[in-house]
UniProtKB/Swiss-Prot annotation:
PROSITE patterns the record matches: THIOREDOXIN_2, TPX
Lineage of the species this protein comes from: Bacteria, Bacillati, Bacillota, Bacilli, Bacillales
Note from the entry: The active site is a conserved redox-active cysteine residue, the peroxidatic cysteine (C(P)), which makes the nucleophilic attack on the peroxide substrate. The peroxide oxidizes the C(P)-SH to cysteine sulfenic acid (C(P)-SOH), which then reacts with another cysteine residue, the resolving cysteine (C(R)), to form a disulfide bridge. The disulfide is subsequently reduced by an appropriate electron donor to complete the catalytic cycle. In this atypical 2-Cys peroxiredoxin, C(R) is present in the same subunit to form an intramolecular disulfide.
Signal peptide, first to last residue: none
TM stretches of this protein: none
Molecular function terms, GO-annotated: thioredoxin peroxidase activity
Cited function: Thiol-specific peroxidase that catalyzes the reduction of hydrogen peroxide and organic hydroperoxides to water and alcohols, respectively. Plays a role in cell protection against oxidative stress by detoxifying peroxides.
Active site residues of this protein: C60
Thioredoxin domain: residues covered: 18-163
Reaction(s) catalysed (UniProt annotation): a hydroperoxide + [thioredoxin]-dithiol = an alcohol + [thioredoxin]-disulfide + H2O
Organism: Staphylococcus aureus (strain COL)
Self-association state and partner proteins as the record states: Homodimer.
Protein known as: Thiol peroxidase
UniProt KW Oxidoreductase keyword: yes
Keyword presence, Protease: no
Gene from which the chain derives: tpx
């Protein structure tokens, strides 16, 4: 998919598209304390990567809470990645009262977005998406939501995560 809609308008996605069965490419993002983080930092663990346009919106907030509460019951790790500033992500985590949420910022280089094909070119934000990776970083599930203001398929993503 190289085009989605956002609030009904067409948006072009840029970056390298990856598919189920591919090995996930590396990326460099920032944590809430401005430390660089890469995919290799989570080696040997299955991962649910929840991608949101902005943590401060209602749909993104609910998506982050849902994956955090449901997927965190499983062994593995849940990452939420957006192009928000790390400070905004840290503030959101504090105001949401969620201590164990891992939010990562792709604002600086859009490394994650470019490597996973989810940069909304017109907005310089990340498209809503979910990637599930096994412990060897093989993509076992991928969804790029066709309308950026809709929720992802929680059931399908969580089933893929639980069945690894």
């Amino acid at each position: 998919m190289t085009e989605i809609t956002f609030k009904g308008g067409p948006i072009h996605l840029k970056g390298q598209q990856i598919n189920e069965g591919d090995f996930a490419p590396d990326f460099t993002v920032l944590d809430n304390d401005l430390n660089q983080v890469t995919l290799a930092d989570y080696a040997g663990k299955k991962k649910l990567i929840s991608v949101v346009p902005s943590i401060d919106t209602g749909v993104c907030d609910q998506q982050t809470r849902k994956f955090n509460s449901d997927a965190s019951k499983e062994e593995g790790i849940v990452l939420t990645i957006s192009a928000d500033l790390p400070f905004a992500q840290k503030r959101w985590c504090a105001s949401a009262g969620l201590d164990n949420v891992i939010t990562l910022s792709d604002h600086r280089d859009l490394s994650f977005g470019e490597n996973y094909g989810v940069v909304m070119e017109e907005l310089r934000l990340l498209a809503r998406a979910v990637f599930v990776l096994d412990a060897d970083n093989k993509v076992v599930y991928k969804e790029i939501v066709s309308e950026g203001t809709d929720f992802p398929d929680f059931d399908a993503a969580l089933a893929a995560y639980k069945n690894i």
